[in-house]
Amino acid sequence: MVGSIICGVDESASARGAAAVARGLSRKLGLRLVFVRVVDEGTSRETFEAAAERLELFMTDTSDAGSSTEWLVETGHPADRLVAAAEDADASMIVVGSHGPRSSLLGSISAEVSRRAPCPVVVVPPGAEDGLNPGRAARGDRDGRRSGAGVSNAGGIVRFDLGARQT
């Protein structure tokens, strides 16, 4: 399979979970991994550079030998920039974290990315910091209401098995 995985990250625990899942998918599918950090428009140069440095450290902490990994720091609205990055890279999928039902901000971002993305979207729930845990199946629906890491695309409920064993 030729292509890339776009993974939206920030400094949250849910982003670490999304990054872990994206790394696992990148290895399993042989896809290039691109971490994308989005900062607000009008961000000062110092803040932008600090975000780039933190992303570089994040990548160093989460990198695996043998996987092709890149990073981008973009300015703008997270959903807009993630969708644009996926379009620019002709991505095979986008991976984003979700803060769960109590956070409407990232929840709304993951929902907006799912609606507008040119490719499948994996929404990683809180508590998935271990990535592709062999004890968990991944499932989801278009609006991300299901538990487990989910894939959403234009049609209904999608279930996929990433080497998970059912219990």
What are these model-predicted stretches?
Residues 85-91:
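Glycine-rich phosphate-binding loop signature in dinucleotide/nucleotide-binding domains
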Residues 4, 92-93:
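Structural motif
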Residues 93-116, 126-133:
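Glycine-rich, Arg-bearing micro-motifs that act as flexible, cationic patches
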